[in-house]
Amino acid sequence: MSRVLLVNPPFYRFLGSHYNASSLGIAYIASHLNANGHDAWLYNADYVNRQSYANLDEMFSQYSNYKEYFNNEDADIWNEVVEKIIEFQPDWVGYTSYTANVNTIDIISRKLKQRLPSVQQIIGGVHATLDPRVLEEVPAVDFAVR
């Protein structure tokens, strides 16, 4: 069957912190896919191997750095995420979305499409459900699950 990688894109890492919990929604999807013969895995691109988190003041002080990542698509984090996805050798990549990470998904999906054009990319989650124009916002993504 298919190799599927379900991705929680980075967000908190841009603000000098991280998010080490798994996304429950994509965990449910991976479980269902695995139970039906697919090889599905999760990739939390916000994961950092440390126990301490930045407080809100520290995160807000990093906002200018956050904006810089979106002005520099050659930043290490973009290449890191795309390389991790490629290492998995997926047939399908699914992204969980909320409004704050749609630009992140756009950059990652475009870079991935350049490197692996045969990989099918899907966006789901809150933003994809609520915004009927989501595929216009992330044109490298092939399908939206609403």
Regions found by a protein language model. Name each.
Residues R3-S17, W92:
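Nucleotide-activated donor-dependent transferases that construct or modify glycoconjugates
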Residues H32-L33, W41-N49, F70-R146:
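Glycine-rich beta-alpha loop elements in corrinoid/cobalamin-binding modules
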Residues M1-V4, D39:
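Residues that mark the start of a beta-strand
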Residues S23, E58-S64, V138-V141:
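Short, hinge-like loop/turn segments at secondary-structure boundaries
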Residues N49-A75:
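Charged, often glycine-rich, active-site loop that binds/positions anionic groups
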